[in-house]
């Protein structure tokens, strides 16, 4: 290779994407190339010609590649044949880009690549000639490789200038950072692309974000169709007068431009401008307003604006004005002369203390924060419909406040108001009134009850101790009086016939008026934190529309009887001395879905509770006197999903049916110290699937032990570990004790170490099973047994005389999943089948190697058994002619068919998925299964050491070799095309043919690992 040829990664061409086609057909490849020719034309000469064989001392720019040079020797070769019209076009285009003279073969000038640095990065600012960099990059100004199209927009120059300024500024202030320069260059490039797309009529909006640019490119103000211009966190200093060229601009938004000090006069001459947003800028003033402006929305936020511009009253189309966190000291009286102004928002303007006398046509006024302490008279804001004054110094409302005939919504929160004017009763259009957190407000005027249109009233956090007569507020639907000194309700309170939601919490109420029962529209009643409230009126139980009743932290000891047809859905009584609930609650409150009676003095629940057929949640926590639940009351709760009995320390027993409730998902018994194991129903100790039982701490160990004894997988694992311990003792000490037939005795020290290693992990798994058994969601598998396996075990029990042997078989069979039980049930009738069932169970759930991997493969094993044609034939025969194929005979015939499937599954289980798939065809024959087992032992055995670890790393490579080997591909294609013999015969032929091939590839893999292990650094003998 010539010395000036660029280095490339082996196996990769530097221009590989240009030669990658998805079709093999040459005609389609030429079509692909033709479609790319227009965009790739400038660099095609570099693809068809190589650099010259000149030495490094030669002048590179004078180097030439001889015409028709051989790509290997640089010698003249054969004349390339014509490629048709495309070839002629390529040659013409190539000749046009070269510097050849007439009479001399024109070839493109090729520059040797002196560097392969990352293109266009600040870390490589010194671009040498020939470096592959991005053309015209501001970080590589001297680097040129490809001819670039002329930029008539000036955007590239603007990008270069802005980046240069940024770099100079960073260096000047000691903030130079290459990575930040890269990010800025990337953002500038994306901004340039965005502007170009808008220039191409791809949109009518420009959004620029986080750019350190003091000015926008001139071309921005030449986009005649631009409608929206927005900058966010751009370091703009000014906008040019050419802004007025954007005669279609509708929205102008500048946010985060701290150095933006002046707005050009042209902004008022934009005929289509409707919205102007100036947030977080440095503006202290605005230019004088000219006539003809179409501005409708003006927002100035977080800016040091000191005054509104002259001629502000000329904005005759301005409808919304928002001034937040500015330095305004006063508002121009011209605001009242704005005929279209509907919304005025003044938030957090610390120097603004008063409003102009007239607000004109303003319909919505928002005053949040600030020092405004008074409002204009009603005549100055006669159009007002919505008033919001929050966190303000407002101390008084105007006396004629009631003259605001259009006012519908008022919020006066956290102010210094002491009282309300009497004229407030004249606000007949008022719908919502919120008076929250006004600590100096102690009373309401008598006229307050005349607000006939009022629908929602909120009086929270005030000093109000009584309400005026409310008879006139007939439209009131929501009343909230929380955290007040309210001591009583008016006598005519029951006249609020439309009241639907009432909250009286944390007050000084002692009782509710008897006419509360007349509130027939009432749906929710909240009485929380009323410590002095001891009784409820009996009429309360006859509120047929009441859906939610909440009593918390009160002194109520008894609930009133419920009337027939009650609509109550939620009843909550907490932290109260309640001693009983109505005996007929289950009859009268059939719609009840949530019943919470916590921290009360209840001793028992009425039996009628069992008739609450819609009840979904029952909470009885921290009832220290609750001793029992009635069986008749619990067993009929068919819809209940959660029962909370936590903290019921005197509870000594539970209904036996509680764990059998069909929809129960959670039962909380934590803190029930009076319960014992004897008092727990079996349906809780061994819960059904999906039932979460939270036991008290003192019972968790006993419950776990009881569950572990009923868990077939745990018993299987314990038995397997016991036999392994016997086998290890026999191997180490030569005991004469008999060793279980399912456990082989290790014949050397390595075998004992391996068995001990796997036993250690099995003990950890057993400990996890014990912990899970004591947890709330532990559920034994006794209800997951297949019906066919139950029948098979019953048949085996009658024929087996040895009970311990049957117990082992029972544990093994029932530890399997449902689908595996279905496929193995036929094997239990014969001893040879029983042995296979126990082997499969111990392989998946025992203490052996790869148990977890084998467990995950069991569903696939079940599928293969179900789809095996000979097994299907035998089962069909036994079903049709049971006398000709009894269970013992069927089991004896099925076992040798299922045994190979199990052996193959056990061999490939720990292997990667690709290798498992590659070896599936081999598992039909004994030789193939033996080879798979050999690969498994060599790669995954505990005693394999470093060699096994290396082999495991190469297993995916082995799978790829098997899948791509030409012999394997040909054999599989041949078998798929021909239908000789039966499917079983074809599978056996395929396995017999592929086994030697895979054996050869496996031997090569082993040899490669062995070769790697013979290096001097890895050989202790050589080190010595």
UniProtKB/Swiss-Prot annotation:
Bias-annotated ranges (Polar residues): 92-102, 112-139
Main location: secreted
Keywords from the named record: Leucine-rich repeat, Plasmid, Repeat, Secreted
LRR-type repeats, residues: 192-218, 223-246, 248-270, 271-293, 295-315, 316-338, 340-359, 360-381, 382-403, 404-427, 429-450, 451-475, 477-495, 496-519, 521-543, 544-566, 568-589, 590-612, 614-636, 637-661, 662-687, 824-847
GO CC annotations, alphabetized: cytoplasm; extracellular region
Region of interest: Disordered: 50-139
Domain of life: Bacteria
Ranges annotated as biased composition (Basic and acidic residues): 75-88
InterPro entries attached to this UniProt entry: Leu-rich_rpt, Leu-rich_rpt_typical-subtyp, LRR_dom_sf, LRR_domain-containing
Compartments where located: Secreted
Function: Probably involved in host-pathogen interactions. May interact with plant target proteins; may modulate a plant signal transduction pathway.
This protein's name: Protein PopC
Biological source species: Ralstonia nicotianae (strain ATCC BAA-1114 / GMI1000)
Gene it is expressed from: popC
């Amino acid at each position: 290779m010539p010395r000036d040829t660029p280095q490339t990664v082996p196996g990769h061409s530097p221009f590989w994407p240009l030669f990658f086609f998805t079709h093999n057909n040459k005609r389609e490849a030429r079509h692909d190339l033709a479609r790319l020719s227009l965009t790739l034309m400038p660099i095609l000469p570099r693809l068809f010609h190589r650099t010259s064989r000149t030495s490094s001392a030669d002048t590179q720019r004078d180097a030439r590649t001889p015409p028709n040079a051989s790509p290997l020797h640089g010698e003249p070769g054969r004349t390339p044949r014509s490629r048709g019209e495309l070839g002629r076009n390529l040659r013409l285009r190539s000749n046009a880009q070269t510097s050849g003279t007439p009479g001399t073969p024109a070839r493109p000038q090729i520059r040797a690549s002196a560097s392969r640095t990352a293109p266009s990065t600040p870390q490589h600012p010194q671009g040498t000639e020939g470096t592959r960099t991005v053309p015209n990059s501001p970080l590589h100004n001297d680097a040129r490789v490809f001819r670039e199209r002329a930029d008539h927009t000036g955007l590239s120059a603007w990008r270069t200038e802005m980046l240069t300024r940024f770099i100079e500024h960073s260096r000047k202030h000691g903030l130079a950072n290459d990575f930040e320069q890269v990010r800025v260059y990337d953002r500038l490039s994306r901004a340039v692309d965005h502007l170009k797309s808008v220039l191409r009529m791809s949109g009518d909006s420009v959004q620029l974000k986080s750019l350190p640019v003091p000015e926008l490119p001139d071309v921005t103000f030449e986009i005649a169709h631009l409608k929206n211009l927005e900058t966010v966190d751009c370091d703009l200093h000014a906008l040019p007068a050419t802004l007025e060229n954007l005669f279609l601009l509708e929205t102008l938004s500048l946010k985060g431009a701290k150095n933006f000090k002046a707005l050009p006069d042209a902004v008022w001459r934009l005929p289509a401008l409707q919205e102007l947003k100036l947030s977080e800028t440095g503006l202290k003033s605005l230019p004088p307003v000219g006539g003809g402006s179409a501005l409708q929305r003006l927002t100035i936020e977080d800016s040091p604006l000191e005054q509104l511009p002259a001629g502000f009253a000329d904005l005759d189309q301005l409808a919304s004005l928002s001034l937040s966190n500015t330095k305004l000291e006063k508002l121009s009286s011209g605001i009242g002369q704005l005929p279209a102004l509907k919304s005025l928002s003044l938030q957090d303007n610390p120097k603004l203390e008063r409003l102009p006398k007239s607000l004109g046509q303003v319909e919505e006024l928002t005053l949040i924060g600030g020092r405004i302490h008074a409002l204009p008279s009603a005549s100055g804001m006669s159009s007002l419909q919505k008033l919001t004054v929050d966190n303000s110094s407002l101390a008084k409302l105007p006396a004629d406040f009631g003259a605001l005939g259009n006012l519908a919504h008022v919020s006066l929160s956290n102010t210094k108001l002491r009282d309300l004017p009497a004229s407030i009763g004249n606000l007949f259009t008022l719908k919502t009134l919120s008076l929250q957190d006004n600590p100096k407000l102690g009373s309401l005027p008598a006229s307050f009850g005349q607000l006939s249109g009022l629908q929602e009233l909120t009086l929270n956090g005030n000093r109000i101790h009584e309400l005026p007569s409310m008879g006139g507020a007939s439209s009131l639907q929501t009343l909230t009086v929380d955290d007040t000194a309210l001591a009583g309700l008016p006598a005519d309170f029951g006249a609020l016939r439309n009241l639907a939601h009432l909250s009286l919490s944390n007050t000084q109420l002692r009782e509710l008026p008897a006419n509360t029962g007349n509130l027939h529209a009432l749906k929710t009643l909240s009485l929380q934190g009323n410590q002095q409230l001891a009784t409820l009126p009996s009429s309360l139980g006859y509120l047929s529309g009441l859906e939610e009743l909440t009593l918390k932290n009160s002194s109520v000891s008894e609930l009133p009887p419920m009337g027939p047809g009650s609509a109550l859905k939620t009843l909550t009584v907490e932290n109260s001395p309640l001693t009983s609930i109505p005996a007929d609650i289950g009859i009268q409150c059939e719609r009840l879905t949530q019943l919470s009676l916590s921290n009360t003095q209840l001793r028992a629940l009425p039996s009628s509770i069992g008739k609450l057929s819609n009840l979904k949640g029952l909470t009885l926590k921290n009832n220290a006197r609750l001793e029992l639940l009635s069986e008749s009351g619990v067993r009929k709760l068919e819809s209940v999903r959660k029962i909370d009995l936590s903290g019921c320390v005197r509870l000594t027993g539970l209904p036996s049916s509680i764990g059998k409730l069909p929809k129960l998902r959670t039962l909380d018994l934590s803190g029930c110290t009076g319960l014992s194991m004897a008092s727990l129903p079996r349906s809780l100790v061994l819960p059904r699937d999906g039932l979460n039982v939270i036991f008290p701490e003192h019972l968790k160990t006993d419950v776990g032990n009881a569950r572990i004894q009923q868990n077939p997988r745990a018993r299987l694992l314990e038995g397997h570990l016991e036999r392994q311990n016997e086998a290890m003792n026999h191997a180490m000490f030569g005991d004469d004790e008999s060793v279980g037939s399912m456990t082989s005795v290790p014949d050397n020290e390595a075998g004992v170490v391996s068995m001990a290693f796997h036993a250690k992990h099995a003990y950890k798994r057993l400990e996890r099973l014990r912990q899970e058994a004591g947890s709330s969601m532990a559920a034994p598998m006794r209800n997951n047994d297949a019906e066919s396996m139950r029948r098979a075990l019953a048949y085996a029990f009658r024929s087996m005389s040895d009970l311990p042997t049957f117990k082992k078989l029972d544990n093994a069979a029932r530890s399997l999943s449902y689908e595996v039980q279905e496929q193995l049930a036929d094997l239990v009738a014969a001893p040879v089948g029983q042995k296979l069932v126990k082997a499969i169970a111990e392989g998946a759930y025992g203490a052996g190697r790869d148990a977890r991997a084998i467990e995950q493969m069991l569903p696939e094993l079940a599928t293969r058994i179900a789809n095996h044609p000979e097994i299907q034939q035998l089962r069909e025969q036994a079903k049709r002619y049971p006398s000709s194929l009894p269970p013992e005979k069927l089991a004896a015939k099925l076992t040798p068919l299922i045994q190979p499937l199990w052996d193959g599954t056990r061999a490939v289980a720990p292997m990667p998925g690709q290798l498992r798939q590659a070896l599936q065809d081999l598992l039909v024959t004994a030789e193939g299964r033996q080879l798979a087992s050999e690969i498994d032992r060599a790669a995954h055995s505990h005693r394999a050491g470093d060699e096994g670890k290396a082999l495991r790393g190469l297993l995916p490579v082995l799978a790829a070799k098997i899948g791509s080997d030409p012999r394997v591909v040909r054999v599989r294609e041949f078998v798929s095309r021909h239908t000789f013999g039966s499917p079983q015969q074809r599978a056996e032929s395929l396995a017999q043919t592929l086994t030697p091939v895979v054996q050869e590839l496996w031997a090569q893999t082993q040899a490669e690992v062995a070769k790697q292990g013979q290096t001097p650094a890895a050989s202790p003998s050589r080190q010595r």
